[in-house]
Amino acid sequence: MSKYLVPVCASISLVAVFGALVAMHSIVVDIDTMREEIVTGVHDMKVMSDDAWNRMIGFTKPSLDSESRSAAFASVFRNKRSAYPSQCNCDANSQGCPPGPPGPPGLPGGRGDQGPSGDKGRDGASGVSLAVTHHLPGGCIQCPQGPPGETGPDGDIGEPGFPGASGSAGQCGEDGAPGEAGITGEQGPQGEPGTEGSEGPTGQDGTIGGPGLPGQPGTPGWPGSQGEPGKNGDSGVDGEQGPQGPQGPDGQPGRDADNGQPGLPGKDGSIGPDANYCPCPARAKKH
């Protein structure tokens, strides 16, 4: 049991580390996405604020010169009443001064006659509403029409139209140039055998070729039938006498031989000296 504990714990730790890495990657991606959204929002806010400021400055440029800008800004940002003196003391210094700011509006006048209808107004530029409202002398300033905007994105694909009338047949085109040789295709299926052709003319005799290389040994043939007995050969020459062989072992004792024929009578012996009488031996019997 203990030998399986270490691999199991190591596998669990590896899975946990892998899950932590995946979660960390997801968090980093979310933070990066949020950062891009914040940067984009700040950039859009800066563009909107710059556009609003340029519009505020542009309202005063067409109708006011450089000498009366202070008066225009004075109408936008009004000074406090305590900044002016209690008495007018501008008689001696009023020579060559620019015109002052417009005075307060008068009492409402009577209703005038109905005027003619005005021309159709120009399309306003798309943008954001100004955060600062102010009163400009002479009412709204007629700004010139701006340059054409950028081309908008392509619209959605419209519904298919009705099929058009068939066009007239066009002129026949010229034959195209022959194309390059294509890749050799795979071998097609075997066709059916053709009809037997007519016998061709007799060919010329071929030249005798040189001797060919020796062929490989053939397989052994079947054993043939037994042949007729051959003629007796000539008698061989007697061989030389060989050396004497070793003495053989003693043979078995032979049987007793037959008695031979009686021998011839012997000659009489000489007379011996006298001695004791000795009888003569008996004669042998004849078989």
From Swiss-Prot:
<feature type="signal peptide">
    <location>
        <begin position="1"/>
        <end position="19"/>
    </location>
</feature>
<dbReference type="Pfam" id="PF01391">
    <property type="entry name" value="Collagen"/>
</dbReference>
<dbReference type="GO" id="GO:0005634">
    <property type="term" value="C:nucleus"/>
</dbReference>
<dbReference type="InterPro" id="IPR008160">
    <property type="entry name" value="Collagen"/>
</dbReference>
<comment type="function">
    <text>Probable cuticular collagen-like protein. Nematode cuticles are composed largely of collagen-like proteins. The cuticle functions both as an exoskeleton and as a barrier to protect the worm from its environment. Acts downstream of the Wnt signaling pathway, perhaps in the formation of the adult cuticle.</text>
</comment>
<dbReference type="GO" id="GO:0042302">
    <property type="term" value="F:structural constituent of cuticle"/>
</dbReference>
<dbReference type="GO" id="GO:0040002">
    <property type="term" value="P:collagen and cuticulin-based cuticle development"/>
</dbReference>
<feature type="compositionally biased region" description="Low complexity">
    <location>
        <begin position="238"/>
        <end position="252"/>
    </location>
</feature>
<feature type="domain" description="Collagen-like 2">
    <location>
        <begin position="215"/>
        <end position="273"/>
    </location>
</feature>
<feature type="domain" description="Collagen-like 1">
    <location>
        <begin position="145"/>
        <end position="200"/>
    </location>
</feature>
<dbReference type="InterPro" id="IPR002486">
    <property type="entry name" value="Col_cuticle_N"/>
</dbReference>
<dbReference type="Pfam" id="PF01484">
    <property type="entry name" value="Col_cuticle_N"/>
</dbReference>
<keyword id="KW-0539">Nucleus</keyword>
<keyword id="KW-1015">Disulfide bond</keyword>
<feature type="compositionally biased region" description="Gly residues">
    <location>
        <begin position="206"/>
        <end position="215"/>
    </location>
</feature>
<keyword id="KW-0732">Signal</keyword>
<comment type="subunit">
    <text>Collagen polypeptide chains are complexed within the cuticle by disulfide bonds and other types of covalent cross-links.</text>
</comment>
<keyword id="KW-0677">Repeat</keyword>
<feature type="compositionally biased region" description="Low complexity">
    <location>
        <begin position="184"/>
        <end position="205"/>
    </location>
</feature>
<feature type="region of interest" description="Disordered">
    <location>
        <begin position="95"/>
        <end position="287"/>
    </location>
</feature>
<protein>
    <recommendedName>
        <fullName>Cuticle collagen 38</fullName>
    </recommendedName>
</protein>
<feature type="compositionally biased region" description="Pro residues">
    <location>
        <begin position="98"/>
        <end position="107"/>
    </location>
</feature>
<comment type="similarity">
    <text>Belongs to the cuticular collagen family.</text>
</comment>
